[in-house]
Curated annotation (Swiss-Prot):
Location of the protein in the cell: Cell membrane; Membrane
Stated name of the protein: Receptor activity-modifying protein 3
Source superkingdom: Eukaryota
GO process terms (BP): adenylate cyclase-activating G protein-coupled receptor signaling pathway; adrenomedullin receptor signaling pathway; amylin receptor 3 signaling pathway; calcium ion transport; cellular response to estradiol stimulus; G protein-coupled receptor signaling pathway; G protein-coupled receptor signaling pathway involved in heart process; intracellular protein transport
UniProt record similarity statement: Belongs to the RAMP family.
Bilayer disposition of the protein: Single-pass type I membrane protein
Tissues and organs where the protein is expressed, per its UniProt entry: Expressed predominantly in the testis, embryonic and adult brain and in kidney.
Extracellular side: 23-112
Source lineage: Eukaryota, Metazoa, Chordata, Craniata, Vertebrata
Signal peptide: 1-22
Amino acid sequence: MKTPAQRLHLLPLLLLLCGECAQVCGCNETGMLERLPRCGKAFADMMQKVAVWKWCNLSEFIVYYESFTNCTEMETNIMGCYWPNPLAQSFITGIHRQFFSNCTVDRTHWEDPPDEVLIPLIAVPVVLTVAMAGLVVWRSKHTDRLL
């Protein structure tokens, strides 16, 4: 019987073969969709440790979310699928809706000022720029008269 140290040299070969199997066998979407809810359940169980009013504060559960992300990536790869993919993203979006639907950020809604204010704010600098350029050109043509 081989010791773990003796089997260690087989690890790269095993990883290579597993990677090739995923590419040859293709993506088992059905299997992936059966396995992803395990990640969601584990995440839900971990989120029960966090008070609901803290669910919008990422620093309160970032470790749990990282674990959830790693789980979805691993389960997706085991089934020979790339991560992320549309089905996995749809599942993750569903988890987001379940836990973070009330986490909207109130942002200031900016509006343009009324036209009575906006037009002068645009027109005055344009007119001044044209006037100053014209003054420079006119002055450069008439410099010999001043000297």
